[in-house]
Amino acid sequence: MSNVGVTDAPLLSMDEDLFSVKPYVTGLSSFINTCETPMTISIQGDWGSGKTSMMNMIKENMLDTVWPIWFNTWQFSQFRMGNGLAFSMIDVLIKGLGGKKNVLSTVAKGVLGFTRKVACVATDAVVGGEAAGMIRDVTTPTEDVDVAQEILRLKENFQKLVDEKLAKEKKNRVVIFVDDLDRLEPAKAVELLEILKLFLDCKNCVFILAVDYEVVTTGIREKYGDNVSAQKGRNFFDKIIQLPFKIPVAHYSVSKYVGDMMSKIGISVEGNDNELFTALIRTSIGFNPRAMKRLFNTYQLLDFVSRGTVMNIPNNI
């Protein structure tokens, strides 16, 4: 018997494109390749709408012309890391550009001064790498940090790394993908964006952030109080994001996907059946990819139950 069920793994390349989003990927890639820099783009959409898949396809489509760096906040979202998340992100950025420990130390001090907090991370297993050591080094109370000076040095060192990396790799620009910001607590997502603001004015850099406007406004209220106006949340978002891109879920071309899934789960599709099934999905759960996968998985389970073909499971489990 062949395997059943559909996994929720994101797509990695346009060869796997299920919903005919190639025009959007191509358009965004062209914009990223030719836009003025620095530039920050947000990929917005509900959970399961395909933000990570879209970013993966953009990355795969641009490997010949840009130097990509990927930071996935989901890997850290389940840990209460304090400022450790920011240091981990900086660690990924600096190492992605070929930076050494002394550069990372300078950056870490700048981040520490900027946030004006003491970072405490319980174990190297969470952060790992040189970032963990940097956290311990720069959070000792024996050294006063000149915030303005450290931030200036941070920007200068980061820009130098960008320039050297592009010259070495013969690429046009560095594209930094920050995924799954909406999986963080909103206030933590805002803190991470505040750290990113330190780097957003670096030439030849494009930042692509998977973050929703609603997450930012909620985070602003959580961090600074409910008295913060909605307009201030909008201003914060607009100051960071120059190009907001909403995942076009309503315009996904899902007819072929629905037909393929119907065949996979044993439903014969004839005549206009596929159009009918597609319309039913659109008017019930919509075209959110994660929701559709759950629908097909649920159908297959119920089909097994109704046919009495569920695997025999010991009663004592």
Question: What do the PLM-derived regions correspond to, one by one?
Answer:
Residues D146-E214, T218, K223:
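Conserved Walker B catalytic segment
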Residues W47-S49, Q75-Q78, D212-T217, V249-V254, ...:
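Conserved nucleotide-binding/hydrolysis micro-motifs of P-loop NTPases
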Residues K239-E275, I285:
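Conserved small helical "lid"/interfacial subdomain of P-loop NTPases
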Residues M1-F79, G84-F87, N157, L161, ...:
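Walker A/P-loop-proximal flanking segment of P-loop NTPase domains
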Residues M57, L85-M89, E191-L193, E222-V228, ...:
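Short secondary-structure boundary/capping segments
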Residues M55-A167, K171:
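P-loop NTPase nucleotide-binding core
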Residues I267-I317:
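C-terminal helical "lid" subdomain and adjoining coupling/linker elements of P-loop NTPases
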Residues V216-K239:
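Short regulatory helix/loop adjacent to the ATP-binding pocket of P-loop NTPases
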